[in-house]
Amino acid sequence: MHRYRSHTCAALRKSDVGSTVRLSGWVHRVRDHGGVLFIDLRDHYGMTQVVADPDSPAFKMAETVRGEWVIRIDGTVKARTDDTVNKNMPTGEIELYAREIEVLSAAKELPLPVFGEPDYPEDVRLKYRFLDLRRETLHRNIVKRTEVISAMRRGMSDIGFTEYTTPILTASSPEGARDFLVPSRIHPGTFYALPQAPQQYKQLLMVAGFDRYFQIAPCFRDEDPRADRLPGEFYQLDLEMSFVEQEDVWDTMEPMIRAIFADFADGKPVTDKFPRIPYDTAIRKYGSDKPDLRNPIEMQEVTQHFAGSGFKVFANMIATNPKVEIWAIPAKTGGSRAFCDRMNAWAQSQGQPGLGYIFWRKEGEKLEGAGPLAKNIGEERTDAIRTQLGLEDGDACFFVAGEPAKFYKFAGEARTRAGEELNLVDRDRFELCWIVDFPFYEWNEDEKRVDFAHNPFSMPQGGLKALSGDDLLSIKAFQYDMVCNGFEIASGSIRNQSPELMVKAFENVGLSQADVEEQFGGLYRAFQYGAPPHGGMAFGIDRIVMLIVGAKNLREISLFPMNQQAVDLLMGAPSPATPAQLRELAIRPIPQKKD
């Protein structure tokens, strides 16, 4: 028999009754039932119940073991009685009667309980992550993450993609976030950068004559911590294709990603055909470029119903500013004054003056609008709004007014809030869609200039003619995102492979041809030697797994994450370098002034 085990803790079944076996694992918990000891023994694969009665030669040792000790047990497999069968465990029809117990490793008093998975301070969980990872839910999430990545690799291979790895040490480039810099010992005073994404390398692969590239790529960005992003690093399914238009990318990747969700969704419905929603439409309907389509609320413009109306606040705004619009947020079943007042109070807590509303109720046989706005605009306009929005008795509608560019985000948040408060969101499904036709440029208010809205390497719709025109902010890009349940899970584009277009695109944001050659020299040179039309995208693996397993945040699907202050509490990173290391790198730290 093997030194440590003949079976795993998930392997034994009723067919093994009578067998002598050896198991090794962690003591999940110990229970004393009338002098008989029950030990739940756990390993990576599962759990087995071990029994040690007073007559067993292993009983004295069993009395000494404690939670999370690592032990080896020899014993005989016996069937449980019908009334003690545990149908929730794969091994629930048997138990192991212990004959011998060996302690392989004792454990100190635990700073973090494993059994029961109670809520515990996150810093403790991260400092003792090796204990936290023993918890069933987190352990299962990590295994699921690996399974999803394996399925992605198989899926990409099945549709003709080949995995290539690109460099980790590369040159710094302005791609939207700060780089993590690595000092060069051989070339003092110079630095490598960890890649924010393999963007330029994968495009260079297409220029080099490869096709259908993919990799599971680590990406590094020195960003301020955010709730929906892990500090430091993340992983993406990165891909690129040659001789394609954007529809080719969509038609290739949609079935593959749908299959990933369907295979791991535990029976939850997954969108069959992903809708393709233009960016402008998404903003106007949902107030977001990553809408949660499980929420059925769709906003509509109702400006005409308030123009010249008795509600002077809106009417005067419309009369004095042609950019002003009134958007309606219909709320099915929200027709109570209490709910409307709650929404209004929430809006004020968000720094807004309030949230105007109308709700409808039957008075006898007549359906009437109620609330201050209804009184001010009158019955005819109120009923016209109800008819346009398809609202009925017991429904409500909220209104947001102003220039859409300034209020659409708040309107989207109000839509989300109403949907959640009214339980309109079906949480047991995956709703996926494409967001397409993103703006190529946007206005940088801080610097008072035009800037790239998203990926500077995207192909602008309209080509050089559009880039040379006067209305740069109207240019759309051949750029697209994939969204699931309100989260952006992928982004991509058809690339700009023309040196002339590349220079012009950057000139419009204030960079010269010399700047382009300095910052993107490799790509710029490559495009002068025969570059095929190409495009691709990248999927955020961590977010996809988070959605699949239903985790609350990304740390629940990551092995050894940093905390929100970008500190690795387990390994003690970041940490000071030694004087000798700094000398080798020709670096002298500058003392930081304390506030």
From Swiss-Prot:
**Region Aspartate: which residues?**
199-202
GO CC terms in record: cytoplasm
- Pfam families xref list: GAD (PF02938), tRNA-synt_2 (PF00152), tRNA_anti-codon (PF01336)
Task: List the residues marked with site Important for tRNA non-discrimination.
Answer: 33
Major site of localization recorded for this protein: cytoplasm
Q: Which GO terms describe its biological process?
A: aspartyl-tRNA aminoacylation
Q: Which CDD domains match?
A: AspRS_core, EcAspRS_like_N
Enzyme Commission number? 6.1.1.23
Q: What subcellular locations does the record give?
A: Cytoplasm
Q: Which residues bind L-aspartate?
A: 175, 221, 454, 495
Listed binding positions for ATP are 221-223, 488, 540-543
Q: Determine the domain of life of the protein's source.
A: Bacteria
Provide the alphabetized UniProt keywords. Answer: Aminoacyl-tRNA synthetase, ATP-binding, Cytoplasm, Ligase, Nucleotide-binding, Protein biosynthesis
Query: Which GO molecular function terms does the record list?
Result: aspartate-tRNA ligase activity; aspartate-tRNA(Asn) ligase activity; ATP binding; nucleic acid binding
The family annotation for this protein states: Belongs to the class-II aminoacyl-tRNA synthetase family. Type 1 subfamily.
Concerning NCBIfam families, the annotation shows: aspS_bact, PRK00476.1
Q: What does this protein do?
A: Aspartyl-tRNA synthetase with relaxed tRNA specificity since it is able to aspartylate not only its cognate tRNA(Asp) but also tRNA(Asn). Reaction proceeds in two steps: L-aspartate is first activated by ATP to form Asp-AMP and then transferred to the acceptor end of tRNA(Asp/Asn).
Q: Subunit arrangement?
A: Homodimer.
Protein name (database record)? Aspartate--tRNA(Asp/Asn) ligase
Its taxonomic path starts at: Bacteria, Pseudomonadati, Pseudomonadota, Alphaproteobacteria, Hyphomicrobiales
